[in-house]
Amino acid sequence: MKINSPQFNLMHKACMKASKILIRDFGEIEKLQVSEKSPGDFVTASDKRVEKVLIGELEKSEYSFLTEETGSIDGKYKDKRWIIDPIDGTFNFLNGLPHFAISLAYEENGEI
């Protein structure tokens, strides 16, 4: 994907908007609602908020989604999809370690 492609620009805008939530929530970790999906695998209210913002921004493309928290969401274009992990490094995030990221990929015809 080229850096000036429409997909890249949309990804950048979505991540910048979602990162504001992460920065705010990282400063208030003790107030976050946390659930355990499976032993040792946690989901936070921040995961859900970030995913919601990313989907809200990216759904304009009408592509499909594969997300860590929601799963698959079909869009108009089945051969193009966004792959989202809203907080890659949730353990670090929850423990106040600043080593986490929003992971977002664009897949077209099975290639990232």
What kind of feature is each model-predicted range?
Residues M1-I87:
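N-terminal subdomain of lithium-sensitive/metallo-dependent phosphomonoesterases centered on the IMPase/IPPase/PAP
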Residues K76-I112:
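DPxDG-like acidic metal-binding loop motif
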